[in-house]
Amino acid sequence: SSAASDVYKRQIRNYEDFKNRLPIQTYEEVKPYVERLRAGEQNLLWPSEIRWFAKSSGTTNDKSKFLPVSKEALEDIHYRGGKDAAAIYFRMNPESRFFSGKGLILGGSHAPNLNTNHSLVGDLSAILIENINPLVNFVRVPSKQTALMEHFEPKMEAIARETIHANVSNLSGVPSWMLVLIKHILEKTGKQSLEEIWPNLEVLFHGGVAFTPYREQYKDVIRSSKTVSYTHLRAHE
């Protein structure tokens, strides 16, 4: 609540106060609160409503972690990170024709959370796609329905069908899954590199996992020296 926030503002005046009042904790320590949030309780870990839970990799005790995602986290961290990366790219590439084409955004899927009304759990990328400004849908591919498909192989085929003949100027996604999609599209079209399919491709935004292990493979499928890559997408944590 705002009253509780005011109390903390008075009690936390510097980093040492913050560290003492809010020490680092493991997922297991906060899990009881997460479970209560998933059951519909509010104002436990954050003062605004929590409706979304990002499903992350497991711990030693659990198969998966369910990380609460607030509206503020979406706006002030994830979407702002994307805007910052785009702004840096435009500053460094003033002749960019980024907006002459569309962005291929590769995401995961989401599902209802414990049958709780208006609450969903899923991949962070799916949560971002679900909540993004509707205007973005006019400048990206594939369709939202296709982007949020659950099963991976049919999803790759559907994305390929929707994007092969599109004018794609930019890519966004996790390097590992994006590479799988790229190879599928190249195999489907019989082409050797993405420039043969999307001649106006100029930038790849990536994140979630390190890009370095995939760098050489990307050089094989994106051969143009004008196409650059930027890391900006945050992971769940």
List each model region and its residues:
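A short, hydrophobic C-terminal helix/tail in secreted or cell-surface proteins
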Residues: A4, A235-E237
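Conserved A3 ("GATE") glycine/threonine-rich loop of ANL adenylate-forming enzymes
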Residues: W198-R215, I222-R234
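Charged/polar positions on well-ordered alpha helices
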Residues: G58-T59, E237
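Nucleotide 5′-phosphate-binding alpha/beta core
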Residues: S1-K55, N61-V203, T212-E216
